[in-house]
């Protein structure tokens, strides 16, 4: 008699539901490819536009209607956006998953794999009796921050006060108060409630997956495992694990691959790559200061100026005088194939907002960072990069200023400190690769044991 898993792949079927923000979407869909390559069939529940042609032919796709006010989605109120999306998603997701289980049987689905930002999805899956795996697309330290957030408010660390910005936070080393997770464009209480719901949902999960390296967050991962009593898995660097995954949400600006040809003409390690990711924004005067800082550094650069980078403007023409100053030395693109840029031998530094995906990609390619965090977890990421791992320099100041931009670039490219940073980053690159079994010496009859191996075993045990 045929098994109820017939047609579901040798290892069973996983329902994957990515969160519809680019920085969240890509890691989840990339890990889904890794699971698929290891014998698991994939059904993608999705709330945003994606093209099935970008994925393996045997993927299934199930739309889930999620609605929100376009004005809200265009805002920077992250807490309200995520809260609204979860509220809208709950009933449609339950209906879709229930229909799938009714049509194919409970045993047809091993588990639901989703983003912890979909706290409603984690909760609904558990309620329906399906094991749920949550992926943290930020650092493990960020989930530790979620868990401590109410305490931080009760002890007066938050909201951040000017006179306390430089104070250490003993509850969350190595942070200073100014490094604490926050979204200044959202209400603090609403943000705290969102994080509390996320932690509650994570506690009910059958496992938590982190796009991080055991090398850099071993203690934090152990702390989370102990506090939540949930298995934890560190699967970074996903860009090395599944290097060919290129699909993304529709609406993201097409990458300009011409910058790779320009990089081919530059000296090894000479170019600064500048990007603030898919969501971070800056005021017009900061854009001007950054432009002049890059010009004054005399450093070759590739700068990503996406359409919504500058608040109030749809495009970002270089300020008067800058274009002439940097002609032949720097190029500006609307979007870049970041992983390929960071892997290019001409790139010797990355001026970044320290979004977690960008931080992980920089480490995996051994590219030192100039850190310029903008919101959320990026401040804490910067503290680890600069003060704990010592693989980057901090761009000092709350507002971008051309002199500080130039100084931070000069520290990375023209000092003994910069050379030491580059040497440490080479070590991190090697260690990151070994974390997923690349460059590991093993017996010829064995495969290197990794957290991904353990994760697949867990899924197949459900």
Swiss-Prot record:
Catalytic residues in the record: 24, 115
Catalytic activity entry: DIMBOA + UDP-alpha-D-glucose = DIMBOA beta-D-glucoside + UDP + H(+); DIBOA + UDP-alpha-D-glucose = DIBOA beta-D-glucoside + UDP + H(+)
Single GO MF descriptor: quercetin 3-O-glucosyltransferase activity
UniProt temperature dependence: Optimum temperature is 45 degrees Celsius.
Enzyme Commission designation: 2.4.1.202
GO CC terms, sorted: cytoplasm
Cofactor: Mg(2+); Ca(2+)
Cleavable signal peptide: none
pH dependence, record text: Optimum pH is 8.5.
SUPFAM superfamilies named among the record's database cross-references: UDP-Glycosyltransferase/glycogen phosphorylase (SSF53756)
Keywords from the named record: Glycosyltransferase, Transferase
A Pfam cross-reference name: UDPGT
Binding site for an anthocyanidin: 24, 376
Binding site for UDP-alpha-D-glucose: 137, 336, 338, 353, 356-358, 361, 377-378
Gene3D superfamilies, per the entry: Glycogen Phosphorylase B
InterPro entries for this protein: UDP_glucos_trans
Tissues expressing this chain: Expressed at the same levels in roots and shoots.
CDD domains linked to this entry: GT1_Gtf-like
Family indicated by similarity: Belongs to the UDP-glycosyltransferase family.
PANTHER family xref list: GLUCOSYL/GLUCURONOSYL TRANSFERASES (PTHR11926), UDP-GLYCOSYLTRANSFERASE 76F1-RELATED (PTHR11926:SF1374)
Task performed by this protein: Glucosyltransferase involved in the last step of benzoxazinoid glucoside biosynthesis. Catalyzes the glucosylation of hydroxamic acids utilizing UDP-glucose as glucose doner, reducing the toxicity of these natural insecticides for storage. Can use DIMBOA and DIBOA as substrates, HMBOA (2-hydroxy-7-methoxy-2H-1,4-benzoxazin-3(4H)-one) and HBOA (2-hydroxy-2H-1,4-benzoxazin-3(4H)-one) with a lower efficiency, but not indole acetic acid or quercitin.
Protein name: DIMBOA UDP-glucosyltransferase BX9
Organism of this sequence: Zea mays
């Amino acid at each position: 008699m045929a098994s109820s898993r017939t047609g579901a792949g040798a290892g069973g079927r996983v329902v994957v539901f990515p969160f519809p923000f680019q920085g969240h979407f890509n890691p989840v869909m990339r890990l889904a490819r890794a699971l698929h390559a290891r014998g698991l069939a994939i059904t993608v529940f999705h709330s945003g536009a994606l093209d099935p042609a970008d994925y393996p032919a045997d993927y299934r796709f199930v739309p889930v209607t999620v609605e929100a006010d376009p004005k809200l989605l265009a805002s920077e109120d992250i807490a309200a956006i995520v809260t609204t999306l979860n509220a809208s998603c709950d009933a449609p997701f339950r209906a879709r998953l229930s229909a799938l289980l009714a049509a194919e049987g409970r045993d047809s689905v091993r588990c639901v794999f989703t983003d912890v930002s979909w706290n409603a999805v984690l909760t609904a899956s558990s309620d329906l009796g399906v094991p749920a795996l949550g992926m943290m697309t930020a650092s493990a330290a960020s989930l530790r921050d979620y868990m401590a957030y109410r305490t931080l408010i009760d002890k007066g660390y938050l909201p951040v006060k000017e006179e306390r910005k430089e104070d250490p936070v003993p509850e969350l080393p190595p942070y200073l108060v100014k490094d604490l997770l926050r979204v200044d464009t959202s209400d603090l209480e609403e943000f705290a409630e969102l994080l509390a719901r996320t932690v509650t949902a994570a506690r009910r999960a059958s496992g938590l997956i982190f796009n991080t390296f055991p090398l850099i967050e071993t203690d934090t991962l152990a702390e989370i495992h102990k506090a939540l009593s949930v298995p934890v898995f560190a699967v970074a660097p996903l860009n090395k694990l599944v290097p060919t995954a290129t699909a993304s949400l529709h609406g993201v600006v097409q990458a300009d691959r011409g910058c790779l040809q320009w990089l081919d003409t530059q000296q090894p390690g000479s170019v600064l790559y500048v990007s603030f990711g898919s969501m971070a924004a800056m005021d017009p005067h900061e854009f001007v200061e950054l432009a002049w800082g890059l010009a004054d550094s005399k450093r070759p650069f590739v700068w990503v100026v996406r359409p919504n980078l500058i608040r109030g403007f749809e495009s970002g023409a270089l300020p008067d005088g800058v274009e002439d100053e940097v002609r032949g030395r720097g190029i500006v693109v609307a979007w870049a194939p970041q992983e390929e840029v960071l892997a290019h031998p001409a790139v010797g530094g990355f001026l970044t907002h320290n979004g977690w995906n960008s931080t992980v990609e920089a480490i995996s390619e051994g590219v030192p960072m100039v850190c310029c965090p903008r919101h959320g977890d990026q401040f804490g990421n910067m503290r680890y990069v600069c003060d704990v791992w010592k693989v980057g320099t901090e761009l000092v100041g709350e507002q971008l200023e051309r002199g500080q931009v130039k100084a931070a670039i000069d520290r990375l490219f023209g000092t003994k400190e910069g050379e030491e940073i580059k040497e440490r980053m080479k070590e991190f690159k090697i260690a990151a690769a070994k974390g997923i079994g690349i460059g590991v010496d093993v017996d010829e009859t064995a495969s290197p044991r990794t957290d991904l191996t353990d994760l697949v075993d867990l899924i197949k045990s459900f």
